[in-house]
């Protein structure tokens, strides 16, 4: 009950053969012991809180009848059902268009403050990380290689991989009338079955030794 999760693709995370109401009622009845009517009342309240248009109407609909943004709001409502202390959001905006992404990010920040919960946000989008995070853990090949404040990551990155990651961001600035060539980190991510000894970034590191 203390940990909930929002998945990357809400359309595939929701059960296609169950109504929205059935899916949001289940955790309330199973974990909170609510009656069917109590679960419906609380479920509708949660759907209203996450900004789903016309919750009463959506209650009896199936996931395929909702847009991606609406499905993600349903997933967020389900995640909040048991009042978690920690909400894990795994790439929650990747499958959404840019306008809806902004709305969902704003909603998550708002809900985090209202519910007083911790938010663990997993993303490859550095722009989103800059907006959402207080502290950042950078992972490479399944290993955390740097952990610090979000400001320090962008202003004073310490690990070579973090530096390369920031350097590889697309730039629109031009030099002598030409755009800069997009930087990439040479080499490939190692297989998790054949990891190098010591630092996992060693084979791709521009400053070995």
Q: Positions of the model-derived regions?
A:
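A short, surface-exposed alpha-helical micro-motif characterized by mixed small hydrophobic
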Residues: 129-131
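Charged, flexible cofactor/metal-binding loops and thiol motifs
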Residues: 149-209
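Helical segment within the ABC ATPase nucleotide-binding domain
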Residues: 102-116, 127
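Short, glycine/charged-rich "phosphate-handling" switch motifs in NTP-dependent
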Residues: 135, 147
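Conserved ABC ATPase "signature" region
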Residues: 38-57, 166-167
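A short, proline-enriched helix->beta-strand linker immediately N-terminal to the Walker B motif
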Residues: 81-85
């Amino acid at each position: 009950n203390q940990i909930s999760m929002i998945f990357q693709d809400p359309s595939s995370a929701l059960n296609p053969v169950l109504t929205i109401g059935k899916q949001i009622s289940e955790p309330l009845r199973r974990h909170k012991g609510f009656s069917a009517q109590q679960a419906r009342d609380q479920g509708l309240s949660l759907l209203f809180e996450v900004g789903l248009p016309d919750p009463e109407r959506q209650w009896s609909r199936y996931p395929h009848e909702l847009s991606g943004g609406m499905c993600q709001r349903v997933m967020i409502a389900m995640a909040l059902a048991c009042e978690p202390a920690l909400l894990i959001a795994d790439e929650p905006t990747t499958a959404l268009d840019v306008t809806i992404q902004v709305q969902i990010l704003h909603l998550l920040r708002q809900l985090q403050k209202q519910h007083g919960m911790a938010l663990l946000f997993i993303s490859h989008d550095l722009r989103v990380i800059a907006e959402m995070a207080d502290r950042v853990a950078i992972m490479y090949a399944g290993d955390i290689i740097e952990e610090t404040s979000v400001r320090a990551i962008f202003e004073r990155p310490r690990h070579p991989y973090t530096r390369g990651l920031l350097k590889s961001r697309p730039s629109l600035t031009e030099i002598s009338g030409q755009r800069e060539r997009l930087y990439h980190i040479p080499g490939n991510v190692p297989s998790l079955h054949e990891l190098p000894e010591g630092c996992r970034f060693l084979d791709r590191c521009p400053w070995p030794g």
